[in-house]
């Protein structure tokens, strides 16, 4: 059966703001090769619909809060997602979706003790730790939004929007993990975007908000305005990376000739 759908998770924990950017991002970078059907789905769909794996090329988890993702999908939901990728599907997790796609998370809460715990998917087999830039993150305001210099492995220095995302701790020590980008201005330049072939499928996890399209942003908070204006000027490298990324995610990780 032809896999011609992109499913975007839209349930408890997903930020409506980042969901809109994610949908626009997928449409924007898919126009050159013909649009896929982009569907918003909830946890009930992923758990109970018996056929979604057969028609889905890419499953996307946008930004928001990871804990509700885990609470809703833990068990049967995550088992089906992992099996879907193993059998040739592709997965993209951005910010909260990247935490959700890792084996362990460690998150410095704005108040109180850090959140730490295991997650089911383990596409990154280590700890997603964040926020990578500490000090300003908030669940209720965009105070943590900032520009993040990114050193892309194949495209050089670029910039992306950041708000609460992770870095992938010790990523160099895990066989099969490909570091696609690093935080260029943080000590040790930790991995910010990683990918991994999982049997026949591809999983990509991104700490920064690579889906953010500044020309759609209407927020008036000063730090958001500065971020938007900067990224409107300095977008060439990120644009090249995103074009390449979406092209890869729209294709099978392995062709029939590779099998």
From Swiss-Prot:
A Pfam family hit: BPL_N
Annotated transmembrane regions: none
Superkingdom assignment: Bacteria
Matching CDD domains: GATase1_ScBLP_like
Listed InterPro entries: Biotin-prot_ligase_N, Class_I_gatase-like, UCP016642
Similarity comment: Belongs to the chlamydial CPn_0128/CT_035/TC_0305 family.
Protein name: Uncharacterized protein CPn_0128/CP_0643/CPj0128/CpB0130
Protein species of origin: Chlamydia pneumoniae
């Amino acid at each position: 059966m032809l896999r011609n759908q992109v499913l975007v998770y839209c349930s408890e924990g997903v930020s409506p703001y980042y969901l809109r950017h994610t949908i626009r991002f997928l449409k924007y970078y898919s126009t050159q090769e013909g649009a896929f059907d982009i569907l918003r789905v909830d946890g009930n769909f992923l758990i109970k619909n018996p056929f979604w794996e057969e028609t889905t090329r890419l499953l996307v988890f946008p930004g928001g809060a990871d804990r509700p993702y885990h609470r809703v999908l833990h068990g049967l939901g995550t088992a089906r997602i992992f099996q879907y990728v193993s059998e040739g599907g592709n997965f993209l997790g951005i910010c909260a979706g990247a935490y959700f796609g890792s084996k362990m998370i460690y998150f410095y809460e704005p108040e109180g003790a850090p959140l730490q715990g295991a997650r089911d998917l383990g596409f990154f087999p280590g700890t997603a730790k964040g926020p990578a830039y500490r000090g300003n993150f908030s669940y209720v305001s965009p105070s943590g939004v900032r520009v993040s210099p990114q050193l892309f492995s194949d495209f050089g220095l670029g910039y992306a929007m950041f708000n609460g995302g992770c870095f992938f701790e010790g990523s160099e020590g895990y066989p099969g993990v490909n570091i696609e980008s690093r935080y260029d201005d943080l000590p040790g330049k930790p991995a910010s975007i990683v990918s991994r072939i999982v049997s026949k499928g591809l999983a990509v996890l991104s700490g920064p908000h690579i889906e953010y399209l500044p020309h759609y942003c209407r927020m008036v908070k000063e730090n958001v305005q500065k971020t938007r204006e900067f990224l409107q000027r300095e977008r060439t490298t990120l644009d090249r990376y995103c074009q390449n990324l979406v092209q890869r995610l729209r294709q099978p990780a392995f062709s029939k000739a590779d099998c």
